[in-house]
């Protein structure tokens, strides 16, 4: 019973967090990719 409840709770949270989280990860993925590119170039002089 606990497992069923846990799955239902997680499933309910997944769709709710997936909707508002989808746009964020999409934007974040692009930002991270861009950051990685800029970071690599900056890493040369801005290693740490």
From Swiss-Prot:
HAMAP family documented for this protein: SspP
Q: What is its main location?
A: other
Ranges of compositional bias, category Basic and acidic residues? 1-12
A Pfam family the protein falls into: SspP
Q: What is this protein called?
A: Small, acid-soluble spore protein P
Of which family is this protein a member?
A: Belongs to the SspP family.
- Which lineage? Bacteria, Bacillati, Bacillota, Bacilli, Bacillales
Q: Which UniProt keywords apply?
A: Sporulation
Give the span(s) annotated as Disordered.
1-48
Establish whether keyword Protease is in the entry. no
Indicate, by first and last residue, each region the UniProt record lists as having compositional bias (Basic residues): 30-48
Where is the protein localized?
Spore core
Q: Which GO terms describe its biological process?
A: asexual sporulation; sporulation resulting in formation of a cellular spore
What up-regulates or down-regulates this gene?
Expressed only in the forespore compartment of sporulating cells.
Keyword Transmembrane tagged: no
